Amino acid sequence: MSASTRNKHSKIHGNEKLDITTDEFDRIRQALSNEEFRKLFFDYVDEIQDPENRKLYEKEITQLEKERGVDVTFIHPQPGFVVKTSIDGELKCFINIASSTVVERPNNEVSVNSQTGQKGLSWSIPMAQTPPRDDLDANNKQCKVFDVVFHPDALHLGKRNAQFRQCLIDTALDGVEREYKVNLDRANLKFPKLDYKGLARPTVLRKLSKDATAEELEPHPLEHMYPKKPAANADQPKVLPMKTKVTPAPTFAVPKYSIKHSHDVDLAEYTDELDAKLQVTMPRALVVEIELPLLSSTADCQLDVTEKSVYLLSERQGAKYRLKLDLPYTVNDKAGNARFDTEHRRLCITLPVVRSTAREQRNLHDTVRVLTREDSGVELNSNGESPVEDEAEAEVEADAIVELQSHDQRDVSDAFPPTAVVSPRSFLKDNLHYKLPASFDCNILDNVIAFVLHVPNVQPDSVQTLQQARSLHLQFASMGSGYYPTHYAFLVQLPDGLEPQLQIDHIDVDAADENVVLRLYMNENCMLLPSYLAGPDSTDLKEYPVFGHFNNNNNNEKEYEGCSLASEKSLYINMDHNDLEHALEVSIMPQESTDPLDSIELLQQQQQQLQQLQQQKKLNKKQRKRNKKQRSLSESACEELKAAQEELQLQHEKQQQQQQLPSTPKDASPERLQNVSQPVDTLKLPQRKQRSYSECNESSSCVQRGILKRFSRYGPRPSISDSCSSIDDCSSTYSCSMDAPGMGFSQSFGGIPEERSGEGDVGLSESCKKTVRFNDHIMKQVFRLDSSILGQRKKNQKRRDCKLRAQQRRLSEGDSADYEEVEHGNGQQPPAHKTAANAQYFKQPNNNNGHDQDKNKKLSMHDSGLDLTNNNNHNNEEETKRNEADAKNAMMFEMDDDDEDEDEDM
């Protein structure tokens, strides 16, 4: 159905549908096809439109009505201006503001406002109205036209004064709305450039004659054919009441809308399941239809949809709409759609409804049941308790507020609404069985008491808390392996006699897959709290110490009762923090049960001790800042080091005595001999992190080590046996941490040499200073930007092989013979792969082998005459192998340097 057809049959028109038969339609068609009939018809139209004929027609009508005792006056409206609006937001409407001398003049009088006392003018503006008539707009669509006629003086005043013009417009709109029961859109008024809409048609004013004769008052035989006579008071005009309050003109119009509930046919709702009809009354979607007749498109329209509302705004001039609509159900605003029908100018919005799950429905029914039971106002004293006691308990319980924590960020609560006030008695449901968590931990840090409840698979939406001043009640549910929920309850309460000033400020609950973490934030520090009360409810509370892990199984209850912690004697826990030694000393001592007053005095003493310790810490910090530049050991540390030296000297003496024995096992190795020579009772000194040489590397003990972890590029490197032996030595309590005083350095400080305060001082000085020396030589490695490191390494390896082969070809027979004699003279068989170039690096160390042995022997002798090297041939062999390996490494590094120089030259 088109818009014109729908408006034609609207109730606004008041016209009945044209009922014409087929026979009548054929007769009209045949008559119009006759030329003579058409000519007569056009003559009739011209006769009606002729002004002279119209005057004659009005004169005859006036004479006829006078014979009936009715005075008739014709009003001919003169053009003024036009106001365009709409009726009920459906149909266009034009109001012609016209003028006629027949209408009385507007008059005014001075009046006083009764509320403000101000003087002003009270206007009386007469007007005449014509019945609405149908017409067509510029688009040939049907519209309504109303005529409101004023005196010409009123229009003249309106042209000169804008306020009076607005008063004329408001008076015309009020008259049309009250006379014809329509609703005009005052927010979207338009003023087209027209003087008059349509053809001007005269209207008639009828009133009874004042001097009517008896014949005129008699009923006419054709009375039923004439218009109805006016009433006796028809000559009195209708007076519209003056508006006492100025109603502001609305800036936006509210469009007409409708909300439809859309429901699909679901065959699952017709089954015999218990939850089949839970969602029957809830629609699948909401369809919102908004009528926007002044909009041809939604380009200038803004639409915002939320879960519970729809907001529409149009700021287009002449089509200002604003609508804020609350929806009856929660909808999914992300999945909705909107469509604008340009033919009917209707906006259709489809929004799917968010349906609650079966679990939420059951929780909702439980909430209604609980609220109905608690708000019924009827209480039965079945236990014989007095009403006064119940009122006192109710006042205490009124302070408890349930805090619902939703970890899924949903608006639907589980068991209680957020604003419900719940007492501790009604916090746990009577129809459920609650268990205490099997194991939980408790710890305190500053003002936070943390509980870890070891319960897996906790449902986050089942966590509920009841917070009071000195207690907290927690309940939650865990889903087991058989998908059956297990309900838990945990009540923690502070003892009444301990720390009465402590109160719970706020809480934090975190439910994870493996446990539940409960944090209580107190109003002040609670580190001195010795114990707390815990249980499933207030009737089954037990006292637990603060620090520890507790199991609540039945098998462990007997062991807990026999434990000293569960005895009646309380425990005294003292913690001392030493900043100098970076240690925390914890002492736990049982003490006899004392009175609450004695415990309070004990807590005060502990607080005083803590304050004294804090003051002492501040003094120690200041002293450390003053002595920051002096890096020295204390006297006690030096005494311990001296004692360690004496003990090591005794160990070396015992080792020498055992080595002088004639009988030694054949398979005895130096490591086994050292293990045998170790004394049974070792020196009990505090174990420290240390780096030390292996005891088998005695020949290199005379060389001072640096503090760098990386070895020098050209210096000797320890072999695999050295590193292995050093790892074995670390297992001892004080392995090789102190050397003889005459060796010039101490290995307990990482091989850094120490300066002596005096030449004659044999022992360690009180201030053992550490010195660091650096080498001025800078080693560098150059890499090309356009090549990778691995590729360059392979390239250098090829160059190195070519260089070695070239050196072998250039060597004379005499040089190669000398190298062979050197190898055979040392009693070693030269390997097949060793070249002459390699031999020049082995020649010097092997020839000086005997001299190095004598030198090492002299250096290894202590000032007291003790030989610390054990004079083993095995050590000499190991030394020779290490020297060969170091020489090879040195040769390889020198070749790398040569290659780098060649690359730079290239």
Curated annotation (Swiss-Prot):
<feature type="modified residue" description="Phosphoserine">
    <location>
        <position position="812"/>
    </location>
</feature>
<dbReference type="InterPro" id="IPR041442">
    <property type="entry name" value="PIH1D1/2/3_CS-like"/>
</dbReference>
<feature type="compositionally biased region" description="Basic and acidic residues">
    <location>
        <begin position="639"/>
        <end position="655"/>
    </location>
</feature>
<feature type="compositionally biased region" description="Basic and acidic residues">
    <location>
        <begin position="875"/>
        <end position="887"/>
    </location>
</feature>
<feature type="region of interest" description="Disordered">
    <location>
        <begin position="793"/>
        <end position="906"/>
    </location>
</feature>
<dbReference type="Pfam" id="PF18201">
    <property type="entry name" value="PIH1_CS"/>
</dbReference>
<dbReference type="GO" id="GO:0070286">
    <property type="term" value="P:axonemal dynein complex assembly"/>
</dbReference>
<comment type="similarity">
    <text>Belongs to the PIH1 family. Kintoun subfamily.</text>
</comment>
<feature type="compositionally biased region" description="Basic and acidic residues">
    <location>
        <begin position="851"/>
        <end position="865"/>
    </location>
</feature>
<feature type="compositionally biased region" description="Basic residues">
    <location>
        <begin position="793"/>
        <end position="808"/>
    </location>
</feature>
<dbReference type="InterPro" id="IPR034727">
    <property type="entry name" value="Kintoun"/>
</dbReference>
<dbReference type="GO" id="GO:0005737">
    <property type="term" value="C:cytoplasm"/>
</dbReference>
<feature type="compositionally biased region" description="Acidic residues">
    <location>
        <begin position="894"/>
        <end position="906"/>
    </location>
</feature>
<comment type="function">
    <text>Required for cytoplasmic pre-assembly of axonemal dyneins, thereby playing a central role in motility in cilia and flagella. Involved in pre-assembly of dynein arm complexes in the cytoplasm before intraflagellar transport loads them for the ciliary compartment.</text>
</comment>
<dbReference type="Pfam" id="PF08190">
    <property type="entry name" value="PIH1"/>
</dbReference>
<dbReference type="InterPro" id="IPR012981">
    <property type="entry name" value="PIH1_N"/>
</dbReference>
<keyword id="KW-0597">Phosphoprotein</keyword>
<comment type="subunit">
    <text>Interacts with Pp1alpha-96A, Pp1-87B, Pp1-13C and flw.</text>
</comment>
<dbReference type="InterPro" id="IPR050734">
    <property type="entry name" value="PIH1/Kintoun_subfamily"/>
</dbReference>
<keyword id="KW-0963">Cytoplasm</keyword>
<protein>
    <recommendedName>
        <fullName>Protein kintoun</fullName>
    </recommendedName>
</protein>
<feature type="compositionally biased region" description="Polar residues">
    <location>
        <begin position="837"/>
        <end position="850"/>
    </location>
</feature>
<feature type="region of interest" description="Disordered">
    <location>
        <begin position="614"/>
        <end position="691"/>
    </location>
</feature>
<feature type="compositionally biased region" description="Basic residues">
    <location>
        <begin position="618"/>
        <end position="631"/>
    </location>
</feature>
<dbReference type="GO" id="GO:0008157">
    <property type="term" value="F:protein phosphatase 1 binding"/>
</dbReference>
<feature type="modified residue" description="Phosphoserine">
    <location>
        <position position="376"/>
    </location>
</feature>
<dbReference type="GO" id="GO:0060285">
    <property type="term" value="P:cilium-dependent cell motility"/>
</dbReference>
